[in-house]
């Protein structure tokens, strides 16, 4: 795909832009205004260094050793030592997309101009992204305060020519990787090591990518639910605008509108409009209310991620002297202030909420799948488990087992990360565990996509039991056709794992919503 470049200015990075850089190798550049802000910030550090006052992380030790003064001759060594000592992560390595998300989100935070670094540091980060030099970063070790220290330290080691990096699929020492990309290692100066490793960027980067994916899953779930509505001979009367105008939650109204648009022109729905059924089961009738609540939860997370992507989250922060109170360290012209912007609680709580919401999305999707398959509840025109010659054949019985298993997993992933740990000699006595929350959310997205894919697979099979002369809605027909590109109708028992994987991948890649958008000549919200 052709991907436009992303301009880093510290103010306008979006989840979509993170996705473009992380997954599609969009090139990055630094805005002129950001460069000026960084230069001004570095000049303030130089001004502070000219005095005798203790300034945290500039001429002192770190954490519980912040009372230790560091001689001027040792300040560069202090920064390099910080990066080395904090590179103590464990566990599986971050995938390339997560590493690139880590790089671009840290770059954008530093570009705001409150971290006291030199432009040179920004330029090397840009070089790593544009030349495809990807630090090897273990996934575990962050407490979500002081930010994501260990992962960011592993990232930062590569800037100073240490550690390992992957280049074009080949692993090599960082010094060799930098040389291959015509990049020079950075000799860190005062404040720069601390600025690099202290922030929420692992949490934010992983959350941004997973949020993009989650919104795709939600739009695909609306599509799957619309197809199930048709195949089960249900009604879209419960999606009438009047119902949602008198309970005006934003997400609910959007999901109801989606169902109406997806099924517009459906001859299947028109065919049984005058039947005797008064109302449908909750899993179909309450789709707008449940999917809408999930949409609101994701919007809640999106607001936090959008803010965090463009925030200064390291500590201390560097300001003009007249912007802070008299107790701040520094001079009349510059102030270096300790704060807590590295604390990931705002993300941890919303990530847990969003993961819980995805568990509910998957749960209601699995219940609709049951109504397609279950001989006790399905409509008379459908065969048990959607199997031709049921009894001899089991049809799609077992894909529902897998969906139910994943729903059970999702319920545990939706638990909030509330455990605390006190570290660094009790100086850092409350942490957020936000990185763990981000990983849980990412896993929840992956599993929910499979559950929604199972519903789409079953909905497409259910279509085979309808009168072929009755057209589906324009949107649901497009989804059916897309499923049939990767999965043939089940005419007799066969292994369905590959079909499930293929349809799940359609959901993850956004291909379901793309097909629907083409058919409706408008994207789903």
Swiss-Prot record:
Main location: cytoplasm
GO CC terms: cytoplasm
PROSITE patterns: PAL_HISTIDASE
Pathway in which this enzyme or protein is active: Amino-acid degradation; L-histidine degradation into L-glutamate; N-formimidoyl-L-glutamate from L-histidine: step 1/3
InterPro entries: Aromatic_Lyase (IPR001106), Fumarase/histidase_N (IPR024083), HutH (IPR005921), L-Aspartase-like (IPR008948), Phe/His_NH3-lyase_AS (IPR022313)
CDD domains per UniProt: PAL-HAL
Swiss-Prot/TrEMBL keywords: Cytoplasm, Histidine metabolism, Lyase
Keyword Membrane: no
EC number: 4.3.1.3
EC category: lyase
Location within or outside the cell: Cytoplasm
5-imidazolinone (Ala-Gly) cross-link site: 145-147
Sites of 2,3-didehydroalanine (Ser) modification: 146
Gene3D superfamilies named in the record: Fumarase/aspartase (Central domain) (1.20.200.10), Fumarase/aspartase (N-terminal domain) (1.10.275.10)
Reaction equations catalysed: L-histidine = trans-urocanate + NH4(+)
Post-translational modification comment from the UniProt entry: Contains an active site 4-methylidene-imidazol-5-one (MIO), which is formed autocatalytically by cyclization and dehydration of residues Ala-Ser-Gly.
GO MF terms, alphabetically ordered: ammonia-lyase activity; histidine ammonia-lyase activity
Family according to the record: Belongs to the PAL/histidase family.
UniProt-recorded name of the protein: Probable histidine ammonia-lyase
Native organism: Halobacterium salinarum (strain ATCC 700922 / JCM 11081 / NRC-1) (Halobacterium halobium)
Gene from which the chain derives: hutH
């Amino acid at each position: 795909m052709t991907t436009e470049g992303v301009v880093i200015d510290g103010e306008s990075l979006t989840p979509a832009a993170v996705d473009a850089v992380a997954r599609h190798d969009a090139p990055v550049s630094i805005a002129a205004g950001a460069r000026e802000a960084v230069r001004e910030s570095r000049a303030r550090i130089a001004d502070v260094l000219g005095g005798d006052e203790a300034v945290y992380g500039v001429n002192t030790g770190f954490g519980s050793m912040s009372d230790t003064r560091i001689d001027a001759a040792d300040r560069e060594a202090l920064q390099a030592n910080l990066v080395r000592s904090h590179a103590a992560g464990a566990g599986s390595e971050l995938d390339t997309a997560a590493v690139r998300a880590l790089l671009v989100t840290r770059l954008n935070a530093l570009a705001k101009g409150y971290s006291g670094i030199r432009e040179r540091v920004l330029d090397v980060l840009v070089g790593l992204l544009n030349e495809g030099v990807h630090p090897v970063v273990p996934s575990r070790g962050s407490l979500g305060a002081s930010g994501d220290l260990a992962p960011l330290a592993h990232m930062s080691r590569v800037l100073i020519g240490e550690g390992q990096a992957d280049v074009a699929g080949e692993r090599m020492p960082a010094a060799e990787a930098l040389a291959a990309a015509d990049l020079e290692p950075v000799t860190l100066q005062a404040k720069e090591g601390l600025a690099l490793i202290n922030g929420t960027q692992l949490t934010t980067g992983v959350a941004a990518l997973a949020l993009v994916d989650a919104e795709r899953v939600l739009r695909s779930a609306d599509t799957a639910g619309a197809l199930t509505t048709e195949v089960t001979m249900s009604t879209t009367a419960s999606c009438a605008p009047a119902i949602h105008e008198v309970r005006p939650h934003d997400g609910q109204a959007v999901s109801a509108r989606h169902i109406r648009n997806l099924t517009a022109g459906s001859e299947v729905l028109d065919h049984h409009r005058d039947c005797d059924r008064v109302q449908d089961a909750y899993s179909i009738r309450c789709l707008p209310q449940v999917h809408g609540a999930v949409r609101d939860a994701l919007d809640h997370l999106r607001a936090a991620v959008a803010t965090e992507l463009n925030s200064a989250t390291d500590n201390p922060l560097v300001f003009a002297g007249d912007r802070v109170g008299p107790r701040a360290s520094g001079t009349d012209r510059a102030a270096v202030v300790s704060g807590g912007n590295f604390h990931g609680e705002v993300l941890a709580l919303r990530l847990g909420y969003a993961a819980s919401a995805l568990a509910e999305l998957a749960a209601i999707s699995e219940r609709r799948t049951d109504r397609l398959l279950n001989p006790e509840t399905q409509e008379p025109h459908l065969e048990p488990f959607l199997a031709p010659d049921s009894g001899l054949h089991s049809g799609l019985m077992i894909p529902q087992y897998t969906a139910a298993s994943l729903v059970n997993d999702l319920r545990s992933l939706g638990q909030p990360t509330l455990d605390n740990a006190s570290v660094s000699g009790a100086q850092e006595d409350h942490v957020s565990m936000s990185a763990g929350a981000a990983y849980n959310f990412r896993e929840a997205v992956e599993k929910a996509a499979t559950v929604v894919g199972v519903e789409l697979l079953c909905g497409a099979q259910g279509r085979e039991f309808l009168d072929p002369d009755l057209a589906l809605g324009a949107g649901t027909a497009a989804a059916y056709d897309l499923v049939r590109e990767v999965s043939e109708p089940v005419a007799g028992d066969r292994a369905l794992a590959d079909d499930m994987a293929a349809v799940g991948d359609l959901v993850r890649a956004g291909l379901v919503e793309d097909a629907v958008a083409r058919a409706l000549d408008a994207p789903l919200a």
